[in-house]
Each structure stands twice: as structure tokens, then as C-alpha cells.
């Protein structure tokens, strides 16, 4: 038995479906023939004629409406068995969402590229979290600065999920500031600040969560004020954007960062698999 795969892209999706189907019949002698990157009428008709001569079953992933119509007419005229893999689910998604499909051949390859960029961004955020390696600052799309408990790490990961490479640096008045901080474009730096009383409550809660006394130097209100003053002075010297996170959620802060730095949200696709 011959199975033809016809695709306007690399044909991996249809080929995998064909392989999965053939695997159910170990005693049948199959021939799998692929016609890929079929993007015009001439190539399509030639592929269909070849399938007809081989008396083949046709599995196709063609997204162009005009080419699908030509294929359907051919199938009907020549009584050739076929299975349209893309059209039914795409049409149903359009019906349910009211959103028209791109109808772009090989679109999933672009989406997969986006997916791997997100993975790369997540790895970057972990690697350069908490000022671990300031050498990464110059590679970052965004550098977050802030005293302890200003949501630097969750913000880094949230923005990384939008394909942005984000590093962050905790600000401690007694600590040395890395030279890379002053080599960065200040337009890529975001200084996070907070209300001292809010920060005091957050730090006390953190101490309680660790089973420690809540009144420590870490949660001391005067120390917090000094830390925030140090941070705000630094932000002024750097000339960077400053965001007060006191009453903001992670999502709200991230949205403000994207808008302030004129960065695009590239998280329009999410998947756990990579196919055609």
C-alpha cells in the first residue's frame, strides 16, 4: 500500500501521522512518499497525479484555501481517498474563537523558534539571578535593580516567559557595585522601589515563615529606609526608570516595564511539543 504525504512545508506532521497509522499494521507492506513545500498549483497537481498513478492514500497538510479547493476537486473527480489534517481543526478553532488563521505555511516552525527563545530566556534569568554573574548584564534586555523583597526574581522569570533576557541585582548599601552596571544603557535598567512600611511587613512575614523572630536588622524600618534611600540615589545617578511596586502585582509591574522600555511581548505561543 502506498501513502502519499503532501505538505506546503516540511511535511513532518503528516509524516508522523502516517507513521503512527502504519505502525498498527506490521504485516502490511507500506510505501511512504513525501511531496513537500508544495506551495503552488502546478506542484500540487503534479503531486496529486503521482498519487493517483500509485493508487495511494493521501495525507496532506495544506493551509492555503485555494490549493485545498483544488485538491478536494481532484480527490472527488478521481475518487482518491484523502485525509485533510489541518482544515477541520483550523476551521473549528476559527469558529469557536472568531479569530481568522494566518494561513501561513510552516507557521509552526516560527512558533517553535519562539518557544526555544523562551527557554533560552528562562535559562538566562536563572543564570543571572540575584547578581550571580554581572558579566551577563551587558547581554540582558532588561536589568532589574532593587533592595531585598522588591520582586526582582519573580519579575525576571515572568519577563523571561515573554522571551526577554532579564538579569537582576540586589542592592545592598555595603556591597560593591559591579562595573558592568555603569557600562549598561540606562534605558535597559529598571529600578524597583517600595514603601518602607510595606517592605517592613513583607520582611517580617518572611522571618516568620523561616521560624525566626520578626524583629531583626533585616526588617528594621530605619534600615529599610536607608536601603531605599541608597537605591533611589543610585537610580538617580544612573538615570534609569523607577517603578514603585508597593501596590502592584507582578503582572502589573511587568506590563509597566514593557511599556516603559518599549519592549514587545513575544509570548504569543506556548507549547510543550515541537512538530512541523
Curated annotation (Swiss-Prot):
Enzyme Commission code(s) on record: 2.7.11.32, 2.7.4.27
Name used for this protein in its record: Putative pyruvate, phosphate dikinase regulatory protein 2
Species for this entry: Enterococcus faecalis (strain ATCC 700802 / V583)
Catalysed reactions, as listed in the record: N(tele)-phospho-L-histidyl/L-threonyl-[pyruvate, phosphate dikinase] + ADP = N(tele)-phospho-L-histidyl/O-phospho-L-threonyl-[pyruvate, phosphate dikinase] + AMP + H(+); N(tele)-phospho-L-histidyl/O-phospho-L-threonyl-[pyruvate, phosphate dikinase] + phosphate + H(+) = N(tele)-phospho-L-histidyl/L-threonyl-[pyruvate, phosphate dikinase] + diphosphate
GO molecular function, one term: ADP binding
Pfam families: Kinase-PPPase
Family: Belongs to the pyruvate, phosphate/water dikinase regulatory protein family. PDRP subfamily.
Superkingdom to which the source organism belongs: Bacteria
Database matches in InterPro entries: ATPase_NBD, Kinase-pyrophosphorylase, P-loop_NTPase, PPDK_reg
